[in-house]
Design a protein with these regions (language model features):
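Active-site scaffold segments
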Residues: 106, 209-210, 230-232
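Short, intrinsically disordered, mixed-charge
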Residues: 131-134, 138, 211-221
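Structured functional modules or segments
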Residues: 221, 229-244
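Buried hydrophobic packing segments
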Residues: 45, 166, 209-216
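Short alpha-helix capping/helix-loop boundary micro-motifs
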Residues: 31-32, 214-216, 231-233
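Catalytic-core "active-site belt" of small-molecule-metabolizing enzymes
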Residues: 2-204, 245, 253-263
């Protein structure tokens, strides 16, 4: 894609995101046709934030999730600082189209991971992580039907990133736990609850974290100290509505909650 095409696609997506509007797909003349094109468009969204990048997310970490949106593998997206909240916050609901909340393991990095020729190992990436947190992602898409547009357009649309809620850091003993078997519960208080387990994200949240680090490395992007990486939903996404109270219980690792504002 040319720089002009990238900018036009970026303008279109940003205007729809901030204006809470939808489109069927990016017009063919400026549509990304590869994952690389999608990431190039996504990168032009970051400077519009006006704040340092908060972190990264991974989408489509399960086979079921990949089939649902018709992609053949995970995708990375950017978490913008102005759309990140602490546990207990009221999160805007607005014109959210997807209307789900997801329970996720999030990691805060304590040192940079600079791109390298070969892949990072799980051990290398986990050593570079400083803390793990229970987290809530409230995704959304700028497309009317995000299940049909394909990976390049989904990546351009920031891999369905929208709002994010970060819980307190878990005790340092998390390093001694097998996160793949760690059980958790997601709840919309008074409405529904679903159980989950760490293995639901690429077999282990630490593997999902490593996938993000290696995806960024392949793109020449530094995963920086202080950035947060959220690793995908460990529960079947919870249906939400304005005014709901969402709570995720990660057992000994703590919990995270938020309330949803009005439309």
């Amino acid at each position: 894609m040319t720089s002009s095409q990238l900018l036009d696609a970026s303008n279109l997506l940003w205007d729809h995101w901030t204006g809470e509007r939808r489109l069927d797909q990016i017009p063919e003349a400026i549509r990304p046709s590869s994952r690389a094109d999608g990431y190039a468009v996504q990168a032009t969204l970051e400077p519009r934030s006006g704040a340092p990048l908060f972190g990264w997310k991974i989408a489509a970490t399960s086979v079921a999730g990949q089939k649902h949106i018709n992609v053949d593998g995970p995708m990375a997206g950017r978490l913008l600082r102005e759309r990140a909240f602490d546990s207990g916050a009221t999160v805007p609901f607005g014109a959210n189209h997807m209307r789900v909340a997801e329970a996720e393991f999030a990691f805060t990095m304590r040192r940079d991971l600079t791109p390298q020729w070969g892949p990072f190992s799980v051990g290398e990436v986990v050593e570079a992580a400083g803390s793990v947190h229970p987290a809530i992602e409230i995704p959304d898409s700028r497309y009317n039907d995000f299940t049909v547009v394909g990976a390049p357009q989904l990546i351009a649309d920031n891999a369905c990133a929208h709002y994010f809620v970060l819980g307190p850091a878990a005790p340092e003993s998390w390093r001694e736990l097998d996160l793949s078997t760690h059980a958790l519960k997601g709840e919309v208080v008074g409405k529904l609850a679903r159980d989950g387990v760490g293995a639901n994200v690429l077999g282990d949240p630490r593997i999902a974290l490593t996938w993000v680090a290696n995806e960024l490395s392949s793109l020449g992007i530094i995963l920086r100290a202080g950035q947060v990486v959220t690793t995908g939903t460990c529960v079947v996404p919870l249906e939400i509505a304005p005014g709901d109270h969402v709570r995720m219980d990660f057992g000994v690792l703590g919990g995270v909650e938020c309330r949803l504002g009005p439309v």
